[in-house]
């Protein structure tokens, strides 16, 4: 790392995004687009682009040891995101979502994240080393979705880790269908 450059950490889940026009579903082939997305990933990319000369932008998540996870890491590097904090978890994979757009242009989403490696990111990391690293970090960013994918014990660990940074940014990003219990979510 370069001297005098500050560190930032974005914690959450980057997912595989599948989108495209399914109007031709009954033909032999339909063309779909493959990309990567997610609230913390998108925020990290734009933060990195805006502050590239001033900040190292680290992405903290869990990924598998599969081809799509490798592609995702290459994309992180292309976007100048540091991959040192990525936890590699055998037998787990990136979450996936698809975007469907109806004839009026309204979008709807479907999610597959039961086997998401990001749900395990707190279990595989060395918390002592991560805590020391975060204490020298200018910004720690995470969202309600970052918490929502984790088990309660891991949610509390992430919240406690975030407090070690000089500045913590939290976007609640509440989704009723995802979080369910509003009172429990507000307590976090």
Residue ranges of predicted features:
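Substrate-binding N-lobe of the ribokinase-like
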Residues: 27-96, 101-106, 115-120
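Acidic active-site catalytic centers that drive phospho-/nucleotidyl reactions
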Residues: 13, 17, 42, 171
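Short, glycine/acidic-enriched loop or turn micro-motifs at the edges of active sites
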Residues: 16, 20, 65, 174
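Residue-level signal for short, function-critical loop segments
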Residues: 14, 63-65, 145-146
